[in-house]
């Protein structure tokens, strides 16, 4: 992907999530069971980063663990909502490609449904390397992305954008799509960028960033809805 276009998509993603912030919070007020289960990787006394925290809902399952929680997101409106919902937590607007933290700062980093919104292999790798930079040696990256290949409606989008790419009508990379966000009345508010990772593609990318992959599996509300990966920063 052309880097100029990738930068445009990063800016577009920020604008899109500001546009849908209230709708997003309304439809994601609860914490699904698969995310609750990922909470088991955080322990008392640890510094934990919620990278791409959105409305802060991960904090709901971590707040009683006596951890030092930090939440960051590119959307100012989502951070405002998170601060209103959880005034005791630390939230700030920040870019996950250039984190405002020192090296070896965190014990754990949660990346829940974020990496698939990062355009281009260059920026995806930069995101992971930046996570590695701020993780302590031996620290864990807990990662989830959507498994578009197991979602029927999403698979149709893959076919559509693959066709557009083949006939030179798309600046996106192969396996990239735009997913419409609709209001309750059915109006399209935003067309969000996603990269449709495969299970092995995700694992290979995480390894390329210098992590050791401990576990990689499919799961979710329906079988195969998401891809999960636990990676360790080498000692």
What do these predicted ranges mean?
Residues 113-117:
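Short catalytic micro-motifs in class I SAM-dependent methyltransferases
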